[in-house]
């Protein structure tokens, strides 16, 4: 065999690839170390941001404690849920960034090895210097990608900080708006309750007005009937020539209230007789007339006795007149005079007696009529009192039922408003949970 020709001595392929692999492994280890350091820095920054957000949230909650006292029990839950959501978002963002950076690192650091493995399968040539320059350019690319990743990561972190701050501000504004909405809902509920109360009072007043109108129409109808009755009474009085005598205060009682319609219709003769009896109540005048009647009857009886005595005397005198004709010429004239006087008195007494009997008959008729009217008035008054007692009892019963019904309605309205408020709070909590999820 001949000696090999002169030229550059080639390095063994195994040694060259082992050096490249070692360099690549060193670079990969350094990149992994830098990536782990970045991950630790990101975790520390995330913890710092979370503490800052918690501090801002505590400050905002301490400022808005007067406005959000009504949701004191649900605020920690919402805060925890918000922090959990923020942590989940930050963890998702960091995981996405880590995956992206890992993929970029893996792509950047696996490409040279793939190239080297491909070049290892090809036959060796004299352009190893060019391959070496290509390998160095592929080794420089990860640094540029790392700087770009750092810049993009810093931008993303700034945006994330701004988003967290704006999210906290928006959450505070949302809580304030929720409190204002709840306050306005309470005001609206109070106004609705007031409007319902006003409507109820209006309905009651309208019903009372309708009742008053009905009573007014009934009273107007009764008044028309009474006017018609008065007109017919006046016509009958004028037709029969009667006279209306109003009754005075009974039994001389000055404080007694005058009775409405306490009048009596009598004939003109009876009216004249009652006027002759003097003034005063009708029963007093009737009592006076009865006393006068008794006196007249007693006088008539006395006169009848005197008349019988005179007749007996006359009969005795007639028997003795034959014997004493001459003696009694002077006394006959006196007897005739006395007889004429007696006859005149008897005729006068008879006339008075007949007149008194007529007056007594008319007064008895008026008394019987008045007694009938009194009985009718008494029965009507008793019936009216019974009806009034029944109506009062029914009114008290209806008032009790109305009070019980109003109490039940108020209780039901209170329970309804309470349930409506609870329903609104549950709806608000549900919407808040859905918005946070």
From Swiss-Prot:
Phosphoserine PTM positions: 18, 114, 117, 125, 129, 133, 137-138
Q: Modified residue Phosphothreonine is at which positions?
A: 136
Q: Name the residue ranges with Polar residues bias.
A: 63-74, 110-139
State the coiled-coil residue ranges: 22-49, 143-239, 282-430
Name the GO terms of the biological process aspect.
Answer: MyD88-dependent toll-like receptor 4 signaling pathway; MyD88-independent toll-like receptor signaling pathway; positive regulation of tumor necrosis factor production; regulation of DNA-templated transcription; Wnt signaling pathway
Family annotation (Pfam families): LRRFIP
Residue numbers spanned by region Disordered? 33-152
Which residue intervals are annotated with compositional bias (Basic and acidic residues) in the record? 33-62, 77-105
Q: Which GO terms describe its molecular function?
A: LRR domain binding
Q: Which UniProt keywords apply?
A: Coiled coil, Phosphoprotein, Wnt signaling pathway
Q: Which family does it belong to?
A: Belongs to the LRRFIP family.
Summary of subunit composition and partner proteins: Interacts with DVL3 and FLII. Weakly interacts with MYD88 in resting cells. Following LPS-stimulation, the interaction with MYD88 is rapidly enhanced; the complex gradually dissociates to basal levels after 6 hours of stimulation. Interaction with MYD88 is regulated by LPS-induced phosphorylation. In the presence of LPS, competes with FLII for MYD88-binding.
Q: What does the UniProt function comment say about this protein?
A: May function as activator of the canonical Wnt signaling pathway, in association with DVL3, upstream of CTNNB1/beta-catenin. Positively regulates Toll-like receptor (TLR) signaling in response to agonist probably by competing with the negative FLII regulator for MYD88-binding.
- What's the protein called, per UniProt? Leucine-rich repeat flightless-interacting protein 2
Organism of origin: Rattus norvegicus
Please state the gene responsible for encoding this protein.
Answer: Lrrfip2
């Amino acid at each position: 065999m001949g000696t090999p020709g002169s030229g550059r001595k080639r390095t063994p392929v195994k040694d060259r690839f082992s050096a490249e692999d070692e360099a690549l492994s060193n670079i990969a280890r350094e990149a992994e170390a830098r990536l782990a350091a970045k991950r630790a820095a990101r975790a520390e920054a995330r913890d710092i941001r979370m503490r800052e957000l918690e501090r801002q949230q505590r400050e905002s909650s301490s400022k808005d404690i007067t406005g959000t006292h009504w949701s004191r029990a649900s605020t920690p839950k919402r805060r925890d849920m918000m922090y959990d959501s923020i942590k989940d978002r930050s963890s998702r963002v960091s995981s996405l960034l880590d995956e992206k950076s890992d993929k970029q690192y893996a792509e950047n650091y696996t490409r040279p090895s793939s190239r080297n493995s491909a070049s290892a399968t090809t036959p060796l040539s004299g352009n190893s210097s060019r391959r070496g320059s290509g390998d160095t350019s592929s080794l420089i690319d990860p640094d540029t990608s790392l700087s770009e990743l750092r810049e993009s990561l810093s931008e993303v972190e700034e945006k994330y900080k701004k988003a967290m701050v704006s999210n906290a501000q928006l959450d505070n504004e949302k809580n304030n708006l929720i409190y204002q909405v709840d306050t306005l809902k309470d005001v609206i509920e109070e106004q609705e309750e007031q409007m319902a109360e006003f409507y109820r009072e209006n309905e009651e007043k309208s019903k009372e007005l309708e009742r008053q109108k009905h009573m007014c129409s009934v009273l107007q109808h009764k008044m028309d009937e009474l006017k018609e009755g008065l007109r017919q009474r006046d016509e009958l009085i004028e037709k029969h020539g009667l006279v209306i005598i109003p009754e005075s205060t009974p039994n001389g009682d000055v404080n007694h209230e005058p009775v409405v319609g306490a009048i009596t219709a009598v004939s003109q003769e009876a009216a004249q007789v009652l006027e002759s009896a003097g003034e005063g109540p009708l029963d007093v005048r009737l009592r006076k007339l009865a006393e006068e009647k008794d006196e007249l009857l007693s006088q008539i009886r006395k006169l009848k006795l005197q008349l019988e005595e005179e007749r007996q005397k006359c009969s005795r005198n007639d028997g003795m007149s034959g014997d004493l004709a001459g003696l009694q010429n002077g006394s006959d004239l006196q007897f005739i005079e006395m007889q004429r006087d007696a006859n005149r008195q008897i005729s006068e007494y008879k006339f008075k007696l007949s007149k008194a009997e007529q007056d007594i008959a008319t007064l008895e008729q008026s008394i019987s009529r008045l007694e009938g009217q009194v009985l009718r008035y008494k029965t009507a008054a008793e019936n009216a009192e019974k009806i009034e007692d029944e109506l009062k009892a029914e009114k008290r019963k209806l008032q009790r039922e109305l009070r019980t019904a109003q109490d039940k309605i108020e209780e039901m309205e209170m329970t309804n408003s309470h349930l409506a408020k609870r329903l609104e709070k549950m709806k608000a909590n549900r919407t808040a949970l859905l918005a946070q999820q």
